[in-house]
Amino acid sequence: MKIAFITPVTPYKENMGGPSGHPYHLLVERPQGIEVEIYSYNANKLSLETIEGVERELRVKIHVLKQPVSFTWILRLHLTFIRFFLKYPIGYYIRLPKCTVEQIKASSPNAIWGYGQEFSGILKQFKEYKRVHTVPDCYSLHWFRRLGCRFTLTSVRDFFRCVVNYRKYYRMERDYDTSDNITAHLVGEEDARFLKEINPSINAVFLRHPHYEIPKKIKSTKFSSPKIKLLVAGRYDLYMKEKADEMVKLLANKDNMGRLQCVYMLTFLGKGWEQHVEKLNALGYEVDHIKFTPDYIKEVCRHDIQLAPITVGTGTKGKVLDALANGLLVIGTPFALENIVVENAVSCVEYHSNEELLAVLRDIPDKVEVYEQMAEKGREAIFVEHGRRHISQQLMDLFK
């Protein structure tokens, strides 16, 4: 079987300048006998050398497409306000030039695969083919959840932006193609349900998110001593702000500091955490701040536990999946752990309040082996239910 894959970003083993990790890991362990040609706008700006490396790793041919002239001028002349007057999100209006459509058809693919919510318009250029549209999230659900979280709406402008984007994505997703020969692929169970509610005739399928890179040599789970290493991964932004602020306030409470300082050291991996790092260091905690690392997985593996204070979001949280797959115990909110096959108090720790978070942080040093076993069970669950080969096979079955 031959598949033509059309994507805004070039696949890469990590998220590099966009959601490049997901398609990479859907392809890297795909079944034998499936040929893939990739047509990418390379919005993540991978170098030619990097693209050639990806071609070898994924056993694919990558064609880099030029950005549409209209978009080039909109950006150059700072005319992005135009999107306000459009019925759908601006990316929906991208179409492949006729010569590229003919090039793809001339390569005789058996099916067309499109990536990203806004590429539904491009997939309409191939109506006669079997098509799979990897959305992968229901973006109207994203904006709907934002509207329900007042702390993310810091100004009238933010509120207005959420309302406008919710309406645009709702309209676009309501009008997704519902033909018999196209399937929408999502990585969130609630995303798939919400999309079907918007567009009852759509064939929408929920598949688990594959895990990303793991070390070639898997070590047994053993927490560090004398201090257990905690990790908070990701930028300090509105998706983590509320719960992260509460977490730092909890750590800074004088009633908790004496106990927690002695048993934990903390790393913030991502931008925007300077204020929290400075505050905790001043209080006597051992805190490190890494804004960027060239080898994300290697850095993750230096830690024992990942704290995931995610307040709002959709789909599957890739950084949480990375931590679980690499043997870290994840302590996270329901939003952090949604769509991941782990069970609270068995293979992860899910918390709903600051009191629950504090209780588990106090409990871990007294029951280290129990929590190490929990982390190991989390890793095992990810290998089984989120294995790349398993998920890739499920995806490729959609093209049949």
Language-model regions: role of each:
Residues 22, 209-279, 291-296, 301:
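Conserved catalytic-core segment of nucleotide-activated headgroup transferases in glycan assembly
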Residues 301-315, 326-328:
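Acidic donor-binding loop of glycosyltransferase active sites
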Residues 1-61, 252-258:
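N-terminal subdomain of nucleotide-sugar transferases
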Residues 346-355, 363-368:
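Conserved acidic donor-binding segment of nucleotide-sugar-dependent glycosyltransferases
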Residues 25, 98-105, 139, 151-184:
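Membrane-proximal helix-turn-helix segments that form the acceptor-binding/catalytic region
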Residues 366-399:
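A charged, aromatic-enriched C-terminal amphipathic alpha-helix characteristic of glycosyltransferases
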Residues 121-123, 164-203, 275-278, 395:
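A short, active-site helix/loop in glycosyltransferases that binds the activated sugar's phosphate group
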Residues 319-322, 329-333:
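Short hydrophobic beta-strand element within catalytic cores of glycosyltransferases
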